[in-house]
Amino acid sequence: MALIGSRRLADKVLDVTVFILATASLTYYSSRYFTTSALVVAGVWVVVALLLFILIRRFTEVGFYGEPVPAPYLTSDPSLYRNNALARNVTWAGLLAAVFAYLYIENVLPNLSPSQWALTILVLVAIGSVFAFRLAKAQVEVAADYKTFHWFAWLIAAGKALVASATLRPQSDDTNYVNISTWIAERGTISIRDTVYSDQVFDTKPLGSAWEPMWGVFAHVTNISAPTLLYVIAVPILTAISIFALDRGMRSMHVRHTNFALIIVSLFLLLDGENLFSFGVFHGPRIWQGKAFFVSAMIPLLIGAGIIWARSGRRNDLIRFLLVAIGATGLTTTATMLVPMFTLVIAGVVGYQRGIKAAGWTSLAMLAPLYVGLAFRGTRSEDSNAMGHLAPDTLAFAQPATLLSGLSELPDPNEFVRLMAEPKLHAALFALVMCWGWLGSESRTARRVIAGMSLLWAIVYVPPVLAVIEEVTGVAQISWRFWWLLPIPMLLGAAASACASGLIRITSINRHKNLTLGLATALLLAFIVIPGKPVWFSSLGQVNLQSARLMWPPGWKVFGGYYEAMEILDVIAKDGDIVAARQNIEFSMSATTVRIHPVLPKVFWFPEVTGPVGKAQYLDRVTIRQFTSKDQDVLLPPLDLKALPGALKRVGVDVICLDADRADAIKLVKTFGYTQGAQVVKYSSGRGQWCARISK
């Protein structure tokens, strides 16, 4: 029972986090119907928290708060010389899957096209998942032994939090998301229209997540700036919580060597910086974003809570699972896709083990994400998705012919199956841990859940299925996130534990445990370290090939040139001004202030969300964007300097900022009348910025 006393504080932190997120979701989606005042929303938040607290006290048994994960039991005998054919077979299956995945990524598999091989992989994963579900029938026998350093998770969490705080990895997505928190913090109202390009002048789609608005409400009430709250205060806290969530998730899966597993997982997350969409990049360097916290913390918590509920059948565990689902729903619109899918798998396992009635209770977790998806997001990508569309959006599901008629081209499975395999050795790593992680999850329930999620992942990426999902939900641009159905970090930790416990073996009787332990661990480390790229050097995904970097002390996660430009803008810009600057500066400008507005930080997003008025200005804004950028974007129309004066006038640009070394461009805009307050600010490590206001 040492585990119960040692990690209970972390479990309490997680329970408080889930409670706060659940109340935030309930508050945001209910208050949207009757108020936009941040102070009123804060009051509703307090009332909802009190009511939910009372309900939890009423319907849970004693000890719900901070209740530890029950001591795990093993489905496989850890004895070194016990004949374990299952462990041997899974070991070889993982090795063969890793080789096959790597050959697929290298495009050296014969006969079939890459798309056909991708479809073959999906079929093989589906078949393997069915076998994995059936093989999870081993009898529960031996209690696990947790004689380890019980505060180790706190040390890992502190280290990861430090790295996340010191990593400067600004995000263009903050243009859309942190901007909302900043608007609420500065203006005290929940936005219902555009706040990036105007003071709620342009039409825009309402935000489907509660994460950003509730951070804004908290910032407004506490009088802390939203960027400081999110970039400086929240980052280390959220990163530490995500480590606790991984630890709890692995304990829920009955991973025997959780501390060793945390070491391997943390190393992977620190070196997973090659891919823009990687687990490592989301886990820490982007943790302030709702979708990042969702994949880093809430998915492990949701899976872990579901496994425990399926195993125990206790009311406390069901309520915790439902609370996690509600809290996760408010983080990101991605949750409206994935939470129902996770729930479907958990409900299937619960029904298999405990009957239809228990599965029905489990399915309640779908209600929140389905409601949010229908009422705040819609069922069609071109829909304005405003509130009040719940009825027609629901009726759309009763008209499958209408939805199917919109399908014009099936997605390519090759695009999605290989998307996360960058670097290429990660394809082998992910295939390996899907097998070895199943083995290292020493619980029949956990193995069934893992098998179910793998099966669902394979089904979702079958082209006709994915096409229907994209048509119904309008998520084509983010359907790559169905990869999150596979909890790779948790599976990696379970695989590491399988190595440490002697389950990885070449023969059914593991007579050389130390040798197999060394070789298996070395293989995992090779797949992590050889292609590894520290997340603090990860690419920002931009044309100029900028990368993240370390900074100290921790500060706002903004792009280079921002502080130089803002030093001038704080003096010469007036409230409501439209400012033209380099794209990266506009990204950070829109995230950190709503006093002024950028011209065009998100190029292709602008005409989609600003309505007819915005579309009429689009080409003018593109012209201005091409001029303020030192390097031309080849995907946009080429710059026409003759059209520039008219574009500046029609858009109403009040201030222009240019790189200080662009003498010819500065000279040109001066002829347009941009001379008032002109000055240059240049830091020792920056390009320098020249800004001036139009003389009127």
Annotate the PLM regions:
Residues 1-144, 374-385, 390-397, 460, ...:
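Membrane-embedded, hydrophobic transmembrane alpha-helices
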Residues 1-3, 131-134, 250, 347-351, ...:
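Hydrophobic, aromatic-rich transmembrane alpha-helices
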Residues 26-32, 317-334, 344:
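Membrane-interface alpha helices of multi-pass inner-membrane proteins
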Residues 114-121, 236, 285, 291-298, ...:
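Hydrophobic/aromatic-rich transmembrane helices and adjacent perimembrane loops
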Residues 138-146, 252-260, 313-314, 355-361, ...:
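Membrane-interface helix-loop-helix junctions at transmembrane boundaries of multi-pass membrane enzymes
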Residues 146-147, 156-293, 297, 539-558:
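Active-site lumenal/periplasmic loops and adjacent helix-entry segments of GT-C-fold
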Residues 160, 331, 335-337, 516-557:
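Transmembrane alpha-helical segments
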Residues 559-627, 645, 649-666:
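Short periplasmic/luminal acceptor-recognition loop of GT-C membrane glycosyltransferases, typified by
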